[in-house]
Amino acid sequence: MSFFETLADRIDDRDSVVSVGLDPDPDRLPEFLDADLPRWAFNRRVIDATHEHAACYKPNAAFYEDSDGWRALEETIAYAHGKGVPVLLDAKRGDIGNTARQYATLLDDDGLGADAITANPYMGRDTLEPYLSRADKGVFILCRTSNSGGADFQNLTVGNDKRLYEYVAQRCQEWNEHENVGLVVGATAPEELESVRDLVDLPFLVPGVGAQGGDAAAAVDHGLADGVGLVNSSRGIIFAGEGAADEDEYFRAVGAAAKRLKQRLNKHR
């Protein structure tokens, strides 16, 4: 079964397109966590609190790139899989072929075993081929990102009155030979989200609806292809318990935040 088939089943089963971003910023982890691997301990409780509402988990590799962090990430992915939830590794990789092949081993069962990965298309198709060729795995390619500086390059007009991100979208559609390609298109610029949807029928990963304040209605209206796609919130969910009196109250708030986002998005499905 392909990644997007697995994701479609999960979306139907949970009636949710919520992607929960697992970005355990060490500076924001609650003080009550007392464990050898605090990021793993935190993620475990987040998964326990949110898995009923999650279509997918999206750990960002930057929060795990040290020895203890990598162990925490391995445990996190295995635990999410144990709950029946697919995992999208947000790594934004992009490098020449030999290096890209090594990055792609993160998808192997004897690597991290992630179900999908994010990738950067700036260096061209050959840098993406190790992901594109994996029919059983998914790759979400950066297209129009949600950060404020995304327009610096992505919105440049590069020919035929098309912007760079529009060319990226069209090319990714051409590369979707194994039906395993999605696009990262942020919710902070809904008119651009719509313009990409007008060009392609790929599933989107739509970040920016949580702490970044993106447009939830546009994220659902334009982010799904045949009902398949993901709308991500990281900080808005996993740190929803900040200020709680105790551990149980903290993670009840986390679970409630995931449920609220699911309900908010489902109003537009």
Swiss-Prot record:
Q: EC top class, in one word?
A: lyase
The family assignment reads: Belongs to the OMP decarboxylase family. Type 2 subfamily.
The UniProt keywords, alphabetically, are: Decarboxylase, Lyase, Pyrimidine biosynthesis
List the molecular function annotations (GO) for this entry. Answer: orotidine-5'-phosphate decarboxylase activity
Which biological process annotations from GO are given for this protein? Answer: 'de novo' pyrimidine nucleobase biosynthetic process; 'de novo' UMP biosynthetic process
E.C. number, please?
4.1.1.23
- Protein name, per record: Orotidine 5'-phosphate decarboxylase
Quickly give the catalysed reaction: orotidine 5'-phosphate + H(+) = UMP + CO2
Pathway this chain belongs to: Pyrimidine metabolism; UMP biosynthesis via de novo pathway; UMP from orotate: step 2/2
Q: Which InterPro entries match?
A: Aldolase_TIM, OMPdecase_AS, OMPdecase_type-2, OMPdeCOase_dom, RibuloseP-bd_barrel
Protein encoded by which gene: pyrF
Catalytic residues (UniProt): 92
- Show the SMART domains listed in the entry: OMPdecase
